[in-house]
Amino acid sequence: FTDKNKLVITLMKSKIASQVCIIDKGFEGVENAVHELFVAVDNLEEMLSNTNPTLFFDLQKYYPAAWALFKDFKEYVLYEKVLDNLKRGIEEQYYRAEINLEIIARMRIEQIDMAFNQMVFSVQKFSTSQVIRELTDHFLYGICTDKGQKLISDFKRKSEK
């Protein structure tokens, strides 16, 4: 590579392609929309365990082209995945039918983004994984029907064992 920026862009493209494969493979055989969200959070935690918390800040500050690729991934690919999950959850009657899909999908993407914001959640005080789990609980309890909330409890009970 002739310059570091090109290397970072190539690595970002590779990481995004890898994440899309991990997401798609992880969703194979999931039982329902609630389970799918738990799998997505597990995949996100797996990715975070191998990621320096300052990576996103550094990308944004020093590598704007690579940051733009990540933003596009988040705003288009992840947004569609969240939207699909919401539609599935409503069809399965685990999510409330009256939610505004576009608003809730965009809110979820912003929640994930916010979890990485060290100005909001300092890594000295909270692990990113802990923040994502709390935000996911808040998100799920807000969109789920009684039937869906029972599933949340079931999945949490299983994961504690």
Which residues does each predicted region cover?
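Hydrophobic alpha-helical connector segments
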Residues: T10, S14, C21-T54, A105-R108, ...
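HTH DNA-binding helix-turn interface
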Residues: F1-T10
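C-terminal peripheral helix-coil segments that are non-catalytic and often amphipathic
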Residues: D84-R88, E92, S122-K161
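All-alpha amphipathic helical-bundle segments outside canonical DNA-binding/catalytic cores
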Residues: V34-H35, F73-K74, E91-M107, K125-E134
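Phosphate/oxyanion-binding loops and surfaces in catalytic or ligand/nucleic-acid-binding neighborhoods
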Residues: N43-T51, V77, Q111-Q118, H138-D146
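Short secondary-structure transition hinges
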Residues: S49-D84, E91-I103
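Secondary-structure edge/capping motif, primarily at the C-terminal ends of alpha-helices
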Residues: G26, L55-L59, M119-S122
